[in-house]
Structures are given as C-alpha cells and as structure tokens.
C-alpha cells in the first residue's frame, strides 16, 4: 500500500489550520495539491484580481517546492473562476508567464458562484521528480 504524506509550504497561511486540510498530499510519485487561492498571509483574499491570481500561483509554487516540484512537474490543472468571461484575460496573462513553453499541462477551467470570498482557485496534480 502506498503511504500518504501531508505536504505544507514554509510559512503556510492560516487557512490550513482554520479549515483542517493539507496543502498537498504526496502519494507515491504523485503530488495532489489542494486548491490554492490568492490569500494574504492572514488568509484574507487579495482584493486586486490579477494580484489574487498571482498570489494563488505563488502559494502553489511554495507548495510544489515543499515537495521538490516545480511548475514543470504539473501534469493536470483544474481552476475555478467566479466570473470567467471577465477574468479570462488576467488569468491568461499570468498563466502564459508561468507555462511559457510546451508541453503544457492538461487544464480544465470551471465557472463557479462561490469561492469563500475569493475569485480564483487552482488545484493541480504533479509528478514528483526522482531524487
């Protein structure tokens, strides 16, 4: 049986303790990262939308790094958006900076009506590189 191990970034934000969940779970050579939002250190949403997206990717980067991964190790992405039509351009600006060369990860974008005060959330599955 494959062991599951919780992974947390350095300087993790208060949402993990408050809502009792792991930033990511390592299972074998896969890393399942919980939805990352654009929260400030106190767990509150960043009000500027593009900055919120950037913070979500910063939080994702920190979680990946805690498991020895980078954005290049991501194989599957699911993102959640409260207003996809009006947010698309800002999201694509940040996405294209981070995933600038193929092969790109799979990506599913989902429009939602509620993200607990946030407007963007991103969860991923990554393959953990061999040590």
Curated annotation (Swiss-Prot):
One of its GO terms (molecular function) is deaminase activity. Pfam families: Ribonuc_L-PSP. GO terms for cellular component: cytosol. InterPro entries: RutC-like_sf, YjgF/YER057c/UK114, YjgH-like. Belongs to the RutC family. This is RutC family protein YjgH. It comes from Escherichia coli (strain K12). The lineage of its organism: Bacteria, Pseudomonadati, Pseudomonadota, Gammaproteobacteria, Enterobacterales.
